Amino acid sequence: MIRKIFIFFFLLAFVNKGLAQLSKVHYIPPLTSGPSNADPLDQWFYISTPINGDVSFKIKPVGGTLDEEISYIVNNSNPKKILIANDGYSQLFQDPATTSVVTNNKGYIIESQDVIYVSVRMNAGGNAQAGALVSKGDNALGQLFRIGTYDNKGNPGNNYLNFFSVMATENQTTINLSNNNIAGLVIQNYSEQFPINNIILNKGESYTVALKVTDSEGNRDGLIGTLVSS
C-alpha cells in the first residue's frame, strides 16, 4: 500500500503559505519556533466555507481524548475564529528541544461534513511579529517532497530557525529524509547528520526537523533541497 504524508515547511519562526485549499479533511502538523522575540503568543484557527448551508466540522487534537474533540458549525456568512492557545508551546507548537523524535501528542486533524478552508494565525515575540499558514487539505498529500526555504544571508539573529514537519495520514508509514549534501549540520535534539531513515509513523503522528541558524554555517541553508519520501 502506498502511504501518504502531509508536510509543512517553514523559515525562521513562521512563513506564510499561499491560499488555503477547500477540503473535507485538514492535517495540521506541529510547528516550532526560535527563542526570544520569536516565542509564540496567541494562536488561532480561522475556518470558513463557501457553502450556503451549515457545515459541521470537528477539531481533533492528535493524542487527545474524545472529550477533547470539539464540533462547530460554519457557513459562508459565519466563519469561525477559534482560540488554540494564549501563548507558549501548546497542542500546535512544539519545543525545538523535543523535535527529531516521533511525536504523538501535537498537531490537529480537522474533519468536516463538507469542504472548508482552514488557516492558522499567531502572534509572537511581544506582538512584534506574527505569522500564518494555510492548509492545503487533501491536495497536499503525497509520497515525495522537496523542502525549500529562503536563503539566510547577512547576520542571522539567535531566534532564526529553519524547520519542517511531516505528519502521517495512515498507520505504519515509513519516512526517509535525505538532504542536499550540506555537511556539518547541527540538528536540534539529534546528534547525527542526514540521511534520517526508517522513521515509522502511525496516523496523526509527526516528525519535525529543526535547525537553529546560528549553530553552524551549514544551518543557514541546510534544509534546502531535503528529500522527504514515504
Segments and roles (model prediction):
Residues 1-23:
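Bacterial Sec-dependent N-terminal signal peptides
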Residues 21-230:
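Intrinsically disordered, low-complexity linker/terminal regions across diverse proteins
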